[in-house]
Amino acid sequence: IAPPESYSSAFQDIYSGLILNYDEMLDREAVFTNPRLLVIYGNYSDATYLSKVNEYVDWKRQKGYHVTAVSTATAGTNSTAIKNYIQTQYNNTSTRPDYIVLIGDTSGNMAIPSYNTYIDYYYTWLAGSDNLGDVIIGRISVETTEQMTNYMAKIASLEQNIDLSAATWLDKMVLVGDTSSSGISTAYTNEYIHDHSLAVNPD
């Protein structure tokens, strides 16, 4: 198998923190590329909503991401079609996403279904037969244009115009669980995040 001609910078910090002698094992002829982001948004024709989607995409491009943005008219309106679309994007190294963002709740005007009843994580099972995600996925859970407008206002406040000297909340975090029994894995995840957070910021 030929070595890759490029590496995504999305996971560089993770790899360098987990792999011994990471810098020495890299192919020196390969280059790092900016992260790829796949945005799938609910197919809703409201002009304000679409302008806010474009605003989000433009902002991510300004931050250096390679962005592919499609509506569910292209990606599909059911979980199987959406998973197949993501898989096709992943199988092509020129479009393979590092991150996926779904814009739309599972109900409402711009609905996008979850992969099963509760979660989107299965959308990220794209390589191999294991149960580990191969990309990072998130969802902007909005049901109306007003909610999307409010979300973009928060992005402007937190990412574009933030006053770091006054942002003491950056030293805090909240871990959210669910009301059902999720097994021991959630407890391990909380402990892992807690330990690594203390390593970064002991205070």
Which residues make up each language-model segment?
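Cysteine-dependent hydrolase recognition
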Residues: 1-203
